[in-house]
Amino acid sequence: MLKRLVFSIFIAFFSTFLCFVLLYFSKGSIAYANGVNSQSKEFVQRIEQNLGLDKPLLEQYKIWLFKALKGDLGVSFLSGESVLKLIKERIFNTFILGFSALMLLFLLSVFLALLGYSYKESFIDKIITFLAFNFFTLPPFVLALLFVLVFGIFWKILPVMGSSDIGFEDDFLNRLEHLILPVLVLVLSHLALFLRIARNFINESFSQIFIQNLYARALREKDIYFLVLKYSLSPIVAYFGGSALSFMMGTYVVESVFAYKGLGSLLFKSIIFKDYPIVLALIFFSVLLAAFFTFLSDIVARILNPRLRRLDFV
């Protein structure tokens, strides 16, 4: 467990360094985000000097790293606000969106996998296979744009911008209405992969000899299904946890398309304007959070599967 924790922290810092290098060598400057396009180069250089952007790459990163190790993530170049303050304002929205989508995706994947096995080789099984593997394989970005076009422009039945309407930030139903499309996009865009994993593990469980013996003993089918579900949930949960980082990145993409007030929209805006403190803080935070969810899923998997409890966390 300790090795995994140390490795996760190392990966988090290494990810921030790679991201910093990419931003450093990309075109553009934060100075132009403050409306100085028409100003002289000397004025732009003065702004970059005030922000410390005139220093060499390694020196800039070293300054950020030492501050981050002390818990100081700095302030936004764009707004001048504390990075921690900006993250705190948006993290709840991202958590609600990501958690809601992940739970719905998990339940739907397991349900459809069981339903497909129950009606194996039937018309229902073929429909599930077709929908999952031929329709729901679009990237989140593409599917989100399609949903904006259909539900926001053509039909105009659901909101496609923001996490709530202005003045209705505390209205539960209004916030729920703004969640529908982002959650659906996340679920449908990931359903093909997660359903395939759930089907494989559940079908493998049904093929186990002890399960076949239960059929031979004429045990009630619902009891057999319960045992199969209990047996197959452990690897399914472990896989979901291992996919936390990629799912989180998908959540960020969906937030940016729907202008959802979460960490994702903040991250993409900061990347565009080269707002280093926010980008590095969010990358670091995202990797650590994904590592935490992976670790948590391993614990749940061991609880679900008693045979794994004897294994050490490595």
Regions found by a protein language model. Give the residues of each.
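N-terminal signal-anchor/signal peptide hydrophobic helix marking the start
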Residues: 2-12
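Hydrophobic alpha-helical transmembrane segments of membrane transport/permease proteins
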Residues: 11-59, 155-175
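Short hydrophobic, aromatic-rich alpha-helical segments embedded in or entering the lipid bilayer
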Residues: 40-70, 258-270
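Residue-level signal for discrete positions within transmembrane alpha-helices
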Residues: 8, 90, 94, 130-133, ...
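An internal, D/E-rich "acidic patch" concept
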Residues: 54-110
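Cytoplasmic-entry segments and transmembrane alpha-helices of multi-pass inner-membrane transporters
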Residues: 1-3, 111-147
